[in-house]
Amino acid sequence: MELDPSDSNSRVVDASQFSKYRDAGALVSKAFHQVASRCVPGASTREISSYGDNLLHEYKSSIYKSQRFEKGIAEPTSICVNNCAYNYAPGPESVIAGNDNSYHLQVGDVTKISMGLHFDGYTALISHTIVVTPPPQPGMGPYIGPGADAICAAHYASKAVANLLATNNSDDPITGSRLRKIVDDIASQFRVSVCPGSRIRRISRFLVGQPTIDRLEEDQNTKHAVEWPAPEEETRKADVTNSLDPANVLSTELNTWHVMPKEAWLIDISMSSQPISSLKEHPDLKPTLYIHDVNVSYMLKLKASRSLLSEIKKEKSVFPFHFGSLSSERNLLGLRELTDRHILVPMPVLISSPSNVIAREELTVITQPNPSSDLLCLTVPTPPSYVKSDFSLEDGTDAALICEGINVNIKSININV
Amino acid sequence: MSTSFACTTCTVAFNNAESQKIHWKSDWHHYNLKRKVASLPPLSAEVFAGKILSIQKQNEEVQKKAEFYQNCEVCNKKFYSEGAYSSHMASKKHRDNLSKFQRNSRIKKLQSEDASSIASSTLSMGEPVVDSEIEEEEDLASQLTSRAISLSNLSLHGRESEPSKTELATSIPQSNEASKSHLFTQEPTPEEIEAELARRSSQRLSPRDCLFCAASFSSFDTCKKHMKASHSLYIPEREYLVDEPSLFDYLAEKISIGFTCLTCNREFKSLEAVRAHMQQKGHTSIAYDTEDEQLELSDFYDFTTSYPDYAVKQDETVVEEDGSSGEGDWEDVSDDSDNSSLDSLEMGRVPIADEYELHLPSGNRVGHRSLSRYFRQNLHSSSTAVGDGASIHQNVARRAMSGNARAYRQAVETSIAGVRDGRKNYSASHIKSFQDQRRREEFANKMGIKNNTKKHFRDALLQ
């Protein structure tokens, strides 16, 4: 296998990269908490997401002013409610004749806020689920129901994975199958299922699983990731080994990689209250998030699309961006051609059936940055909303033990940088 | 003496009328009449008789002379005078021919014996040896052909007799000289050609001989210098010439065996003739203008150093040794692909659309003209994307796709990016149906009819 030595070095986080990771994590967490506080009944999702983007823009401008590397929004603020899974970030297009047609939050909405920031490609992504509640009143009970199950499952699953990564050592390496198994365990204990699009993956500079590059990384065989839904051959193989010898599954399952120290990992787990095989695009909402595929080149015909592309090349990097953040309205004429030619890849609003509720937790962690410390969580884990699930982790199971995390030392960064 | 019966013309008198009438009918009287008209005196009977006698004698002699006829079969000559005949028979030429003729007649006799024996034994139809004709024919060429025919007959029937074989063997060298003069008029047999070739190659020029004059030198180099200095011989594309001795060998062969001019490729009958031609016309250069002429000499040349990817290949091998900048090379190669229909990319493994492209040994790719609009577009290289992120993604993509996938992507990027299936189908049918050719022909047809300049060829079969 061909491996660029410089590239494989970049997988391991050194000191200067570490500070960038930490700054990105701190700032995005700070922004997140401010955005989360805005999620009150009646708030417009358009306003919240634009507020989040403005915050991110402001924060990223405030730091590394003298440096000339790329920095910016790694994921525009998206506010996905209930059965919406990903990428709902309404922009100016939702305002029609002065009316804000974007979704307005209501009490009891399971709201997933995700955002991300990067400095020089070192990226911190965060995603958290909150339940929209009226201002706390005495005697108000917790949020219950399928949504609560999903929220709890997502919370515990992300925590368990983080704990598992923290216990990583060379004697007992963390493998993909172990990560997959613990998430699946927790989902089954809460009677929910893991939503497609969930992933636990190693990230590196500029490579955080963007859809434009994700498949290529897979070809390259350097991608260390656990993804849901599981690739077909993996499940098939797991079935075979299960039928042969259930006890031996972990050791026999194909594990070409395991977690190493000083690696950045992205934990992005979504739990849906109902089992779903795939998400579908929203029929009416047009995608507002786009990502530039730098590996496609085409001679564009429209002047508008050419100038739009040159602006995107100048302003945006390889991360998703909100098309509302592009300066000139006129050039948006060229958007169609750019997407037709696959130069821009739209990130459609993905939804499941209306009765379904999806919860999502996303963390960025760095494994064992120092030999003494165990795990650094770049994004400040937000305490879950006041929810109560009918189910809980059964005592004695692996998942419960890991979630308790007795011997686990997780350090969180200071939000006030 | 009565004068009643007299002839005044001849001044003679007769006894009676009867004798007078006979006289008037006589030749003597007629002769004297003619003399009288010519106002000459009449001749007497005696003189006239003497004259007649002398004329008769002269006539006899002429007659005798005219009756002389001698035919010399050997030399195929006829003689009407004895002196000429006797002098011919005494001549050396006749004696030479005689000896030849005797030998040939012996051969003929043997052949006719053979032929008749074959004819009698096999009763084959259309026996090609027609004895009577051949015996009359003195032409050596026809003898030779008949011998060839009889030879083939012999081998066909497998009844070769020892004496005829030896006879043939001895007769061949002797016949060569005779056949020389007939080489260009008669159709030569394989044996003749071989013999001629052997004769010519025996006098072939050595590398130390000048091609254009009779001079000979001590070494090949001095010979070359001489040809360059005094005949101003110029060797085309000298820097790519790899096999100089073979080239001169070939040229010498061409001149001394083929008797062919180097410049105009005209054939002559002898080495002297072709040399004279070349010197007179100044044809002392090697023809190297047309493609055929270049191909003729292509064995002695090696043009690989002139190929565009030659230097690149060498660079690559150098680069691979240090191993780190191999990636960069790729970009450079694709960057300078401004003449996009002739890209010097890594060839041979581009899987796309073989039917639309030709892969030249030099590494160039030639696209079909039906896709020219795609080949001609000047694509900005994707490396124009700014920033580290873009370059990292491109690196990942480039490394991810190894071999065919990468080549495919390269091909897509540089040549037929954005060619849709419909267009490809159009191209396929374009190529399949010879559309270009047909379109040209139809246009020529249309213009011909419109301008009344269409060529009309009558069908030869209908005439």
Curated annotation (Swiss-Prot), chain A:
CC annotations in GO: cytosol; nuclear envelope; nucleus
Keyword Membrane belongs to the record: no
Annotated TM spans: none
Main location, first listed in the record: cytoplasm
Enzyme class label: hydrolase
Gene Ontology biological process terms from the UniProt entry: proteolysis; ribosomal large subunit biogenesis
Entry coiled-coil feature ranges: none
An MF annotation (GO) of this entry: metal ion binding
Function noted in UniProt: Probable metalloprotease involved in proper assembly of pre-ribosomal particles during the biogenesis of the 60S ribosomal subunit. Accompanies the pre-60S particles to the cytoplasm.
Family: Belongs to the peptidase M24 family.
The protein, known as: Probable metalloprotease arx1
Gene label: arx1
Curated annotation (Swiss-Prot), chain B:
PROSITE patterns the UniProt entry points to: ZINC_FINGER_C2H2_1, ZINC_FINGER_C2H2_2
Gene Ontology cellular-component annotations: cytosol; preribosome, large subunit precursor
Cited PANTHER family: CYTOPLASMIC 60S SUBUNIT BIOGENESIS FACTOR ZNF622 (PTHR13182:SF8), ZINC FINGER PROTEIN 622 (PTHR13182)
Residues with Phosphoserine modification: S150, S155
Predominant place of localization: cytoplasm
Keywords recorded for this protein, A-Z: Cytoplasm, Metal-binding, Phosphoprotein, Repeat, Ribosome biogenesis, Zinc, Zinc-finger
Assembly and interaction partners: Associates with nascent pre-60S particles that have not yet entered the translating pool, and is released from mature 60S subunits.
Keyword Zinc: yes
Pfam families tied to this protein: zf-C2H2_2 (PF12756), zf-met (PF12874)
Protein name: Cytoplasmic 60S subunit biogenesis factor SPCC550.15c
Annotated GO biological process: nucleocytoplasmic transport; ribosomal large subunit biogenesis
Regions of compositional bias (Polar residues) in chain numbering: 113-124, 167-188
GO terms assigned for molecular function: nucleic acid binding; zinc ion binding
UniProt keyword Ligase present: no
Transmembrane segments: none
Region feature Disordered, mapped onto this chain: 109-136, 155-189, 317-341, 444-463
Family of this protein: Belongs to the REI1 family.
Domain of life: Eukaryota
Free-text function comment from the UniProt entry: Pre-60S-associated factor involved in the cytoplasmic maturation of the 60S subunit. Involved in the dissociation and recycling of other late pre-60S factors before newly synthesized large ribosomal subunits enter translation.
Natural source organism: Schizosaccharomyces pombe (strain 972 / ATCC 24843) (Fission yeast)
Residue intervals of every C2H2-type zinc finger in the record: 5-30, 70-94, 208-231, 259-283
Subcellular location: Cytoplasm
Record's compositionally biased regions (Acidic residues): 317-338
